[in-house]
C-alpha cells in the first residue's frame, strides 16, 4: 500500500477593480511557512471593506484589489491495484493581500469584488467535481496538478471576461446581470 501526501498548493489571484489580474504562485514550502490570515468562502458571509487590510501604493490607479486562492491537499492510497484519493479543496480570501481606496469605493465596487471571490468558489467546485470524476493512474500527483492548472487557466479567463463585460463594475446593468447569474450558479451547485 503506497501513500502519497500533498499538503497545500495555492495560487493567489489578485483582482483589481479597474485593473487586470496578477498571479502569485507559491511553492509548497512557502505555503507551509505562511501563517497568513484567510477568510474561507461561505454563502453566509459576504466581504466587507474592513476585510481589505492590505496597503496600496500611492501610484496605484485601481480602486481595489481582491486576492483569492484555491488550495488543495490530498492523500492517495493504492490498495489492490486501485487508487483511493482523499482530497480537500478550499477557496479563500487573503485580507493582507487585498486592499481598497475608500475615496474611490462604494457598495457597487464591493459587490464587484465579492463576485470575484464567488467566481473563485465556483471554480473550486469545478475542481472538486473533475477530481471526483477522474480515473487516476500511478501518476496521481501530476494528474491532480494538471487538473488544478487547467482550472486556474479557466478561472483566469472567466475573471477577465467578468471584468471586461462589467467594465470593472462601471457598467451597472452588466454588473447586476453578473451578480444574478453567479448567485444562481452558486445556489444550483452547492
PLM features: residue spans?
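Active-site scaffold of zinc-dependent metalloenzymes
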Residues: 81-105
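Bacterial Sec-dependent N-terminal signal peptides
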Residues: 1-28
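Membrane-interfacial alpha-helical segments at the cytosolic side of multi-pass membrane proteins
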Residues: 122-131
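Metalloprotease/metallohydrolase-associated module, dominated by Zn2+-dependent proteases
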Residues: 29, 33-84, 93, 136-190
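Active-site His/Glu-centered metal-binding helix of metallohydrolases
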Residues: 110-119
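Acidic/histidine-rich, surface-exposed loop or edge segments in extracytoplasmic proteins
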Residues: 104-107, 132-133
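Short alpha-helical functional segments enriched in proximate histidine and acidic residues
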Residues: 117, 130, 158
